[in-house]
Amino acid sequence: MSKASTFSAPKGIPDYVPPQSAEFVAVRDGLTRAARLAGYGHIELPIFEDTGLFARGVGESTDVVSKEMYTFADRGDRSVTLRPEGTAGVMRAVIEHSLDRGQLPVKVSYAGPFFRYERPQAGRYRQLQQVGVEAIGIDDPALDAEVIAIADAGFRSLGLDGFRLEITSLGDDTCRPQYRELLQEFLFALPLDEDTRRRAEINPLRVLDDKRPDVREMTAGAPLMLDHLSESCKAHFDEVLAHLDALGVPYVVNPRMVRGLDYYTKTTFEFVHDGLGAQSGIGGGGRYDGLMEQLGGQPLSGIGFGIGVDRTVLALEAEGKSVAPPARVDVFCVPMGAEAKAALVKIAHQLRANGIRVDLAYGNRGVKGSMKAADRSGAAVALVLGERELEEGVVVVKQLATGEQETVPLDQVVDKLGDLVEH
């Protein structure tokens, strides 16, 4: 009989397993902490949505919609898509649940997996883990600065310092149409291939986002949006920069920056880390003042960002840093015999109820094997219990780092460990 075939994760989809997963969780939690401190509530979104939401919200001309979405028909023959980004889904939820009818701005944060069919490479996966925030309903440069500062604070809380913030303005409906005509006039004079020409007709900004060296060389002299802003857009951008200066958030103005989604207006930004090579982006976002109305809601503005958790982990590795996760457990129980195991199972339950992380040597490993497991667990303390200790009503409390040990009455061990274990 042939051996049964084994399975592996789909190409480009990573697993997160202990102990490395502790680093991933610590980075994700660190990136969301700054948003919580600024009053951003958690929002949980569906993994898949109506395909039309992303086609309309993200933009038909984007690579995300035209090349990278996981789209399929469900059993009801409805076209659905695994979410490629978070903003469109947030806006749909805000409209559907009338959050925009309450106190503004609506401030939400989220974390979870998103899906894009692209060539897998280091830190670029087909299932990407992302943290994001959105602030909806108020057009205020100070709010733009707050959102950007939250991302900056998240990175710095992890000890990351080799990143930089690049920022620009993409204008709005008062100045973009004239700039669009100017840019198209420039692009149509170039020897572009048919596909690139088509993109230039739909959304010429997409061409400036092209990563191919020959296209980048041809468009090096293209007119820049930053040079054609309306007075109101220029004033908005200048005020954002003034707020960032006041907050001590360093930045570099990059007039050639174009984000990969069509809904961005005015303030647009990206965080990059040169330790990641050509694929240097670790997060970014911007203002999207027409998106809610485009999706059937009120004409309210919004701004947000998405940060790649996987990319941030790689950036920390490039700097030789780790967000030191805590030990997996605080206490490891080593029973010698069935009665001792029953007693330690009860003690472990009591310790956990008091907020102490506890594991136990299951199976019949013997003392030597159990103590090795205790050392590998990262615990600070081992509880060793055998027949003699049971008869005396005590347990051995051993400090694993120093080897020091003492006997403690069984009815006092919970209080004793509360003093010994640091959280």
From Swiss-Prot:
InterPro entries: aa-tRNA-synth_II, aa-tRNA-synth_II/BPL/LPL, Anticodon-bd, Anticodon-bd_dom_sf, His-tRNA-ligase, HisRS-like_core, HisRS/HisZ, HisRS_anticodon. It catalyses: tRNA(His) + L-histidine + ATP = L-histidyl-tRNA(His) + AMP + diphosphate + H(+). It is found in: Cytoplasm. Its EC number is 6.1.1.21. One of its GO terms (biological process) is histidyl-tRNA aminoacylation. Keywords: Aminoacyl-tRNA synthetase, ATP-binding, Cytoplasm, Ligase, Nucleotide-binding, Protein biosynthesis. NCBIfam families: hisS (TIGR00442). Homodimer. This is Histidine--tRNA ligase. It comes from Rhodococcus erythropolis (strain PR4 / NBRC 100887). The gene is hisS.
